């Protein structure tokens, strides 16, 4: 019985050694697999090829029924290209920033996984000097209940509210700025000559990197958030006598 077993093993090894290998199944830059490579090694090579052809933004984070169960590798937040001063992952709600001057401090100190290093502004520098007023009034808040957003392709996507990082639940916050009132004065924007100009305040947007759902995986996407309040002007038609 043992002799038959050894004979079968020998025949199996000879068959594997004689089997031809196709170079088309080998990733670029690698040599042809040796005869002693097993099917497991072959499957690993296939997985590597698929990973190299996949988009760089995809994250290997599986969904287990609910978004709060998604586990994310903290090393992903060390990539500089994924950082945004308006996106914050924190275990506790960030303090309410009175204006965008406080934005750097909030992002740099509240979340260890997406810190940004930017030049420090003087805390004693006032936003407006005496006698100066803003053309439009804006309000800035940290938004922590965003569930959907519009991506850079114009499609509506689901935003991850919470992720698990090192066995701690981090919530995803967005620092958004929008207009308090489209018409801060009766004529529109403040300080505009209403005799010659029509004016109104409107909220503008920008795109930031955020963790969103992509099928059954978490993925980085550019999503649109409110970031500023600006004055829109149009010249009034001149009436000719």
Curated annotation (Swiss-Prot):
UniProt effect for mutating residue 221 to W: In HSAN5; impaired processing of the precursor to mature NGF; nearly abolishes secretion; loss of function in stimulating cell differentiation; loss of the ability to activate the NTRK1 receptor
SMART domains on file: NGF
InterPro entries recorded: Cystine-knot_cytokine (IPR029034), Nerve_growth_factor-like (IPR020408), Nerve_growth_factor-rel (IPR002072), Nerve_growth_factor_bsu (IPR020425), Nerve_growth_factor_bsu_mml (IPR020437), Nerve_growth_factor_CS (IPR019846)
Amino-acid positions noted as binding a 1-acyl-sn-glycero-3-phospho-(1D-myo-inositol) in the UniProt annotation, renumbered to this chain: 173, 209
Covalent S-S links between cysteines: 136-201, 179-229, 189-231
PROSITE patterns in the record: NGF_1 (PS00248), NGF_2 (PS50270)
GO CC terms, sorted: axon; cytosol; dendrite; endosome lumen; extracellular region; extracellular space; Golgi lumen; synaptic vesicle
Propeptide feature ranges: 19-121
GO biological process, one term: neuron apoptotic process
Binding-site list for a 1-acyl-sn-glycero-3-phospho-L-serine: 209
Its biological purpose: Nerve growth factor is important for the development and maintenance of the sympathetic and sensory nervous systems. Extracellular ligand for the NTRK1 and NGFR receptors, activates cellular signaling cascades to regulate neuronal proliferation, differentiation and survival. The immature NGF precursor (proNGF) functions as a ligand for the heterodimeric receptor formed by SORCS2 and NGFR, and activates cellular signaling cascades that lead to inactivation of RAC1 and/or RAC2, reorganization of the actin cytoskeleton and neuronal growth cone collapse.
Family of the protein in this entry: Belongs to the NGF-beta family.
Disease affiliated with this protein: Neuropathy, hereditary sensory and autonomic, 5: A form of hereditary sensory and autonomic neuropathy, a genetically and clinically heterogeneous group of disorders characterized by degeneration of dorsal root and autonomic ganglion cells, and by sensory and/or autonomic abnormalities. HSAN5 patients manifest loss of pain perception and impaired temperature sensitivity, ulcers, and in some cases self-mutilation. The autonomic involvement is variable.
Subunit structure: Homodimer. The homodimer interacts with a single NTRK1 chain. The homodimer interacts with a single NGFR chain. The NGF dimer interacts with a single SORCS2 chain (via extracellular domain). The NGF precursor (proNGF) binds to a receptor complex formed by SORT1 and NGFR, which leads to NGF endocytosis. Both mature NGF and the immature NGF precursor (proNGF) interact with SORCS2 and with the heterodimer formed by SORCS2 and NGFR (via extracellular domains). The NGF precursor (proNGF) has much higher affinity for SORCS2 than mature NGF.
Stated name of the protein: Beta-nerve growth factor
Organism, as annotated: Homo sapiens
Record lineage: Eukaryota, Metazoa, Chordata, Craniata, Vertebrata
